[in-house]
């Protein structure tokens, strides 16, 4: 058996894998166990009662978290004309059309989010095999294909997170940094859950939000008692 690291031993001692913790207790536990030499992200996994094999039960969207994510986000925008100027004024690091596409093809992808105006999709569409596997392909459902690119840039900079369920029906995303105030982490999580519940597929049967777990970048997951969250109302 592989030798457990000191951190993993501490996590096993502190975290009861069979227990769903009060949200405040769960956050306190994460903060206590976050001993990495960098400020770890706080991530969430939400198990949904959907059948991901059916297209009408897939959940996908985006939300600007009330307290942001704590990340500096670099934004690339495919657009032209007045929209290009608006995107730059909104804070986009990279703005262009064919010239920006050539950078992407050359492997120059120093950005975290890609936004496109509808008229630019003829250019972006040819980059699907590069952007798609990296989760960067713009999509109307996440607000990254839009005529109002300036607003999309501002949302990305303000702490918007995009989400979609994986093949097991689980949503994975971030809700902030471990050095966030506990109340801010709780409110970010609640805002995400409200957004997910608004998107419950009509075809989904039974319990929709089955399990909520939070973790840090280098830590184990801590299950959260949903009854301690405002979003359960």
From Swiss-Prot:
Transmembrane segments: none annotated. One of its GO terms (cellular component) is cytosolic large ribosomal subunit. The keyword Cytoplasm does not apply. Keywords: Repressor, Ribonucleoprotein, Ribosomal protein, RNA-binding, rRNA-binding, Translation regulation, tRNA-binding. GO terms for molecular function: rRNA binding; structural constituent of ribosome; tRNA binding. InterPro entries: Ribosom_uL1_bac-type, Ribosomal_uL1, Ribosomal_uL1-like, Ribosomal_uL1/biogenesis, Ribosomal_uL1_3-a/b-sand, Ribosomal_uL1_CS. GO terms for biological process: regulation of translation; translation. It holds the Pfam family Ribosomal_L1. The keyword Flavoprotein does not apply. Belongs to the universal ribosomal protein uL1 family. Binds directly to 23S rRNA. The L1 stalk is quite mobile in the ribosome, and is involved in E site tRNA release. Protein L1 is also a translational repressor protein, it controls the translation of the L11 operon by binding to its mRNA. Part of the 50S ribosomal subunit. This is Large ribosomal subunit protein uL1. It comes from Shewanella amazonensis (strain ATCC BAA-1098 / SB2B). The lineage of its organism: Bacteria, Pseudomonadati, Pseudomonadota, Gammaproteobacteria, Alteromonadales. The gene is rplA.
